[in-house]
A protein has these predicted regions:
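N-terminal hydrophobic or amphipathic helices/low-complexity stretches enriched
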Residues: 10-36, 48-55, 93-96, 199-201
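Second-shell loop/turn segments in exported
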Residues: 28-36, 111-116, 193, 214-219, ...
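A non-catalytic alpha/beta surface segment that caps or lines the substrate-entry region
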Residues: 32-79, 98-103
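An extended, acidic, His-containing surface patch that forms the Zn2+-binding/catalytic region
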Residues: 76-78, 184-186, 241-303, 310, ...
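Active-site metal-coordination/substrate-binding segment of hydrolases
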Residues: 78-145
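Fold-level recognition of mixed alpha/beta catalytic cores in primary-metabolism enzymes, strongest
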Residues: 116-292, 421-432
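Short amphipathic alpha-helices in soluble, non-transmembrane regions
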Residues: 222, 329-337
Length: 448
């Protein structure tokens, strides 16, 4: 059993139970990206909003790539808050699922389906809270804008980038509340709440080795396969320098308070080379939060056994710290490889912008922190830097203070995100809906 707090004003209405119904319907709409097909999901949301007389608009960036926006008006005393989540999902390997990923199956207290966690659970919770505030006629000091966007899974030009470039006036805001972060469950209870205030920046690099093509029976010193293999081995095992920022410094200090004895000892001695070696071997996520990471993901070269190719390539997934100097990083990589046959270039396209972390002293961060303490009194709350990427990065680049939080998850639940049998706890979704409701009341309602 997982113990959640249920003390929330939202629980007195229908918002929490509605979220599960909305999620079921959204899972049934296949928005795998590519191709996306988010307009169909946006039309479903519009039909729900229409029932309550809430005006909404769908903006298509391309055929079928819909983004939907709605607004609850406030007094204008404070600038708007953007309540956002993305409609698209990653694809599936159907044969590896034990349930149909696009039906929405509930068993043993979990709702299964693609997007059950990332990110249709947040779409559903946002919609439920948005409707609850409307039904309760909550007087607001700031507008609350609902956005469900396309293209987050690798094609933000169809979603958040399109909305910023073409319809910024529809989503212009002071704060954004998005996916990311964590409500982490251990031994049946929430032990920490991590609020995402920044994220690592994805950068793609292509490593190319060039040589002389020829017959495979004659070994050549400039064989591109050999050179690319040696370069990838060096880059893939390079321990880049450790560097803390304001977010990760607080994150690791607080994580040490609840960590097991081994991890606690490591976190208290981060500067030790022995610590970094152990973290690389056992604590991969924490290791990645400490540095810019370089991960080889694709190698291409050759087309038949008896032919030495003229070139070979490797793709590197670089997740850079927000303040990383990418040209300087490439120079360091070239020095490390030290091979004139190797060229390292940055790929362009679908990159997220680097931007400063969101502050820890804003009204929204304080509301998220206070609500977490109220609902999960035995848990610690801390800021977090995501190793992955979200649409918050584009908003932070516009000066928006954007924060991320996600539905409650165990480690097993987290492992299923983007994987097989993705799921979310029904009880956890209800609790998450209550959490969002109380955060919005604290930061947007009058007399709070």
């Amino acid at each position: 059993m997982i113990a959640f707090s249920t003390a929330s004003s939202c629980a007195q209405g229908r918002g929490d139970s509605e979220a599960g119904d909305f999620l079921l319907q959204l899972i049934k709409i296949n928005t795998s990206n590519p191709p996306g097909n988010e307009t169909q999901a946006a039309q479903y949301i519009k039909s729900v909003l229409d029932k309550y007389g809430i005006p909404s608009e769908i903006f298509e960036s391309a055929a079928g790539r819909g983004n939907i926006v709605a607004r609850l008006k406030g007094s204008g005393k404070a600038r708007p808050l953007l309540l956002m989540a993305h409609l698209d999902v990653v694809g599936v390997e159907r044969e590896k699922w034990t349930v149909d990923p696009f039906v929405g199956v509930i068993k043993n207290g979990y709702l299964y389906g693609r997007g059950a966690s990332d990110d249709k659970a947040m779409v559903a919770a946002n919609l439920a809270v948005f409707l609850q505030l409307h039904r309760d006629r909550v007087p607001l000091d700031r507008d609350i804008i609902f956005l469900a966007e396309a293209g987050e899974e690798g094609t933000p030009k169809y979603g958040i980038e399109y909305m910023i470039e073409n319809h910024w006036e529809k989503i212009d805001c002071e704060f954004a509340l998005n996916e990311g972060g964590a409500i982490h469950i251990k031994d049946g209870a929430v032990n920490y709440v991590a609020i995402a205030t920044t994220e690592k920046v994805p950068r793609g690099l292509i490593v190319t080795a060039r040589g002389t093509s020829g017959h495979g029976s004659i070994p050549r010193p400039d064989n591109p396969i050999v050179h690319i293999s040696e370069a990838v081995a060096k880059l893939g095992t390079w321990q880049t320098p450790m560097r803390l920022n304001d977010t990760t410094r607080v994150y690791f200090q607080k994580l040490a308070q609840i960590a097991d004895p081994e991890l606690k000892s490591l976190l208290e001695n981060l500067n030790s080379s022995e610590t970094q070696t152990v973290m690389r071997q056992k604590y991969w996520t924490e290791y990645s939060k400490l540095r810019t990471s370089i991960v080889p993901t694709i190698i291409k070269g050759g087309f038949r056994t008896n032919v030495i190719p003229g070139d070979a390539q490797a793709t590197l997934d670089v997740r850079a710290l927000p303040d990383e100097n990418i040209p300087g990083l490439i120079e360091e990589m070239e020095k490390l490889v030290n091979d004139p046959a190797i060229e390292i270039k940055r790929t362009l396209g679908n990159e997220r912008p680097a931007s400063p972390p969101s502050r820890l002293d804003t009204a929204l961060y304080r509301a998220m922190e206070a609500t977490a303490k109220k609902m999960f009194p035995n848990a610690i709350t801390m800021p977090d830097m995501l190793t992955g990427a979200t649409d918050s990065s584009q908003l932070r680049a516009k000066g928006v203070q954007a924060y991320g939080i996600s539905t409650p998850k165990t480690d097993e639940d987290s492992r299923r995100v983007h994987g097989n049998d993705e799921r979310t706890s029904v009880e956890g979704l209800n609790t998450f809906t209550q959490y969002l409701h109380d955060v919005l009341i604290a930061v947007a309602a009058q007399n709070h």
